[in-house]
Amino acid sequence: MKNLEIKKNKGLKLNFTILILFAIHLFSILIAFKTKDFQVNEYPLARILDSYLAISLFFNPIALSSLVKKVIEIEEKNNMWQMQISLGLKVQKILIDKIKNLSIKVFLLQIFEWLLIIFLANKNTNFDLDVEIIKRIIIYFLTTLSINISMILIFTIIEIKSKKIYFSLFFSIVGAMSGIITMLTSKVLSQINPFGLFATILNINYVKDGQVYTQTMNNINYLTLLISLIYIILSLIYIARLNKFTLSKDI
């Protein structure tokens, strides 16, 4: 089944979509790195990470929705769903394999990006890879990965339940906008909005001190990792129990 998924994914340009997402992330990373005050910034890693997370807040839902749409859409062509079901394969198993493949691609992309972030942060003399920083890196790496996987699962559910061909892409844009809105309006809503979770792990807080703003580090947010894992578990349970699917769509 794994080899079959790889064969089906050929020609879908999944890697091209991931490359575009990487280019967007790289742009945000380099913007933070190239600022005039970066070399003297007290929190170089946090500075780059926050730029990376802020851009991910809007673009990741759209990119991940596009990836999910591509791998589901291929099944709708040439009656692939019916063919595989007739061979004894369950729709749930096919979906889980697709989710695994996309999650691995996102995981590999994220490893490369985070290594690059750490490498660039190390260019600042204030960067010190102490226990607290290592803990923050590990927790937020896992949190970011969990958020991405939870969105893959959510878009898979939307794609398999929706009858409209472009609904999931429209939903991803609305979701991305909702993430930005909740970031600007409510910490509580950001914490429960699956598309606003990136905003809850921003590292730097700006506090007004007279006429200037000073930077302080936020405490590590462990709750977001827990919430994203809950979304993953609930989505997997939902997919496993699905008994009605939309295997073709209206334009």
Which residues are covered by each model-predicted region?
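Aromatic- and glycine-rich beta-strand/loop motifs that create alpha-glucan
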Residues: 1-22, 245-250
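Membrane-helix interface segments
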Residues: 13-14, 90-92, 133, 164-169
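Alpha-helical transmembrane segments
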Residues: 15-26, 108-109, 231-232
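Secretory targeting signals
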Residues: 26-64, 69, 96-162, 172, ...
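Terminal transmembrane helical anchor/hairpin motif
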Residues: 32-47, 169, 173-251
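Membrane-interfacial segments
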Residues: 36-40, 73-76, 80, 116, ...
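Transmembrane alpha-helical segments in integral membrane proteins
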Residues: 62-76, 80-81, 151-167, 228-246
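Helix-loop-helix units of permease transmembrane domains in multi-pass membrane transporters
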Residues: 70-103
